[in-house]
Design a protein with these regions (language model features):
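Short, hinge-like loop/turn segments at secondary-structure boundaries
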Residues: 8-12, 81-84, 129-131
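Conserved SAM-binding loop
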Residues: 1-77, 93-105, 150-162
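A C-terminal cap/extension of S-adenosyl-L-methionine-dependent methyltransferases
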Residues: 111-164
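Non-heme Fe(II)/2-oxoglutarate
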Residues: 80-81, 118
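Short hydrophobic/aromatic-enriched beta-strand-loop microsegments
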Residues: 12-15, 84-86, 111-113
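Conserved acetyl-CoA-binding loop of GNAT-fold acetyltransferases
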Residues: 108
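Acceptor-substrate binding/catalytic loop of class I
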Residues: 82-97
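Short, flexible, mixed-charge acidic loops at enzyme active sites
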Residues: 73-80, 125-131
Length: 164
């Protein structure tokens, strides 16, 4: 928080969410953009979080977040291990292909989904061959991961289309 205030000169607070009172903290009730970078998976009650984000955004405002992906190579190749090895404070794992259906219920329209967190070393073929990151096989798998959107994390950008 200190860095954001002193170096970037953005007003910021450390507060509980979704209980924050933005009128008290910032002097305004709605924003053009709300972001949550690797935060959303830590909320137990996603409904109250998405409801609050809708409340905080102006019409046509942008909600952008990143989170682990349940459609990445780790989840697809090692499903049991993926969930067992997920941190205990992760309460949701997003499937990018279903994001629009979920977010629509909370007044959002998905504008863009970006597959991130590409790790060729997590692909079974790379694990078996133990090839180096400079090998042709590695580079092909890395490209395939990006083309097929098999990153282990995802960024989702959506627009508020209606109030709840």
């Amino acid at each position: 928080i200190d860095y954001v205030k002193t170096k970037l000169h953005f007003p910021s607070v450390c507060s509980a969410f979704p209980q924050i009172d933005c009128a008290q903290e910032f002097g305004i009730t709605q924003f053009d953009v709300v972001t949550m970078w690797y935060v959303i998976e830590h909320f137990q009650d996603l409904k109250s979080v998405l409801t609050k984000v809708n409340e905080l955004l102006k019409k046509d405002g942008i909600f952008a977040f990143s989170t682990p992906s349940a459609e990445g190579v780790s989840a697809k190749s090692y499903k049991e291990n993926f969930f067992e090895n997920s941190p205990s404070d992760h309460f949701s794992v997003w499937e990018p292909s279903k994001a629009n259906v979920i977010l629509k219920k909370f007044g959002f329209q998905v504008e863009k989904i970006v597959s991130t967190g590409h790790h060729p070393e997590r692909f079974p073929s790379i694990k078996k061959s133990n090839c180096s990151s400079s090998s042709l096989q590695w580079k092909i798998v890395e490209k395939l991961s990006k083309v097929k959107q098999l990153g282990d994390t995802v960024e989702i950008y959506c627009r508020k289309i209606r109030d709840l």
